Amino acid sequence: MSNLRTLVFYATPEHPCSYLDDRLATTMFVDPKADINLDLYTRLSQLGFRRSGNHYYKPRCNGCNACIAVRIPTEEFNRTRSQERTWKRNSDLTVRLRSAQFEQEHFALYQRYISARHQDGDMYPPTLDQYESFLLEARSETLFIEFRKDSKLLAIAVTDRTTDGLSAIYTFFDPNEDKRALGVYAILWQLQFAREQRLPYLYLGYWIRGCRKMSYKTNYRPIQVLVRDSWITI
């Protein structure tokens, strides 16, 4: 069984940054053959690593530290007035926890979401292979959180459970339901669920100053940022 001291890491060649124009990025990732158990996954999350499919990675770019890992302490979190309105607006939804397995209904919603929201990104056009490798080929304790209005599926939040929290992997939702702010609601729900489960943190990935797609993460306060391997509350 692998441990942090025996892990082997690799680095990708420089490639165009997905978040900041005119920047080159390098990604450090764990050897895909490594046996990542729950404790090791937790430690990697604490060090700022993220999971995508079977890959655990962290930005390691020359001359750039723009990607800052963030997490929310669940016991200290308080909703803003806007977030409270979003919470109440979606009180008519039912929530169900599912395991990570293929469902045609889930994939159809994913296709609609990517096609409507991310035509300018490398996830478009959405394919079955991409969907499965991204969200289903996990060796972790992964949950698919379904949000429904009556029988209609409106959103899916994919999240991993670690020993110290939840790690929000991806959320996709009905692009015709903008007024519900389902992306916000999914984060609020995970925060509430983690608190009820006595899990101290919700990991949200990377906050990137100057990147509109990532700026929303600092709307959840208090928030902790990883700076020089130490978590600091801002």
Curated annotation (Swiss-Prot):
Primary subcellular site in the record, as a coarse category: cytoplasm
Signal peptide region: none
EC number: 2.3.2.29
InterPro entries listed in its UniProt record: Acyl_CoA_acyltransferase (IPR016181), Asp_Glu_LeuTrfase (IPR017138), N-end_Aminoacyl_Trfase (IPR030700), N-end_Aminoacyl_Trfase_C (IPR007472), N-end_Aminoacyl_Trfase_N (IPR007471)
Keyword Nucleotide-binding: no
Compartment list: Cytoplasm
Pfam families: ATE_C, ATE_N
HAMAP family: Bpt
Protein name: Aspartate/glutamate leucyltransferase
Protein species of origin: Hahella chejuensis (strain KCTC 2396)
Gene: bpt
